[in-house]
Amino acid sequence: MTPQEKLRRFEEQISPHLKSAYNLAKWVTRSREDAEDVVQDAFLRAFSAFESYRGDDAHPQNAKAWLLTIVRNTSMTWLKRNRNSGATLGFEEALDDPRDRSPDPEEILLISCDREEVRQALEQLPLDFREAIVLREMEGLSYREISAAVGVPLGTVMSRLSRGRDWLRRILSTPKRLNPKEGAGLR
């Protein structure tokens, strides 16, 4: 394959998944800037390894899973190097970047409802569970694609999703105590 053909195929098959790659990196690193660095590094790695990619135009999800595997591995390497940085990312920041598209009014309302509560619940999940939920619920990967991307058996993916969802359900259904400052208007 010529360099021009490699670049063309890469742009057609891999580049459309840039937003998904960025979203996954954002959830893992908890920082927009670090996610950008991770994605840049992952795309360089993907381009270097692209000749070994065996996907085709008929199976674009395979390209997404292949790329997200690289992004995940790059993110994990970043995480090992920067574990003590303490970076945090707000839930609203972890959603699709508003520069990518304009949400409709219904979507704005849904996103704003209980945003902080959901963010806090997701933050409490162990990385393995959070990663599985992000790949499934936000990026739309199948169980098999998650299995390939994360490098664990299909049963482990199913278990992580089930346990992660149960954990989220428990966190979100626990009654919250009012902070005295928050309850000031309820006399």
Language model: regions and residue ranges:
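A short pre-motif secondary-structure segment
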Residues: 132-136
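Structural recognition of an alpha-helix C-terminal capping motif at a helix-to-coil junction
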Residues: 37-44, 48, 61-73
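C-terminal edge and immediately downstream basic/flexible tail or linker adjoining helix-turn-helix-like DNA-binding
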Residues: 1-4, 8-10, 86-93, 144, ...
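Arg/Lys-rich amphipathic alpha helix in sigma70-family domain 2
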Residues: 51-54, 68-90, 103, 111
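A short, charge-rich alpha-helical start-of-domain segment used by transcription regulators
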Residues: 1-23, 33-39, 47, 51
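Sigma70-family region 2
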Residues: 3-4, 43-61, 81-83
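Acidic, proline/glycine-rich intrinsically disordered inter-domain spacer in sigma factors
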Residues: 95-123
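Helix-turn-helix DNA-binding motif, specifically the short coil turn and the N-cap/start of the second
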Residues: 31, 142, 151-156
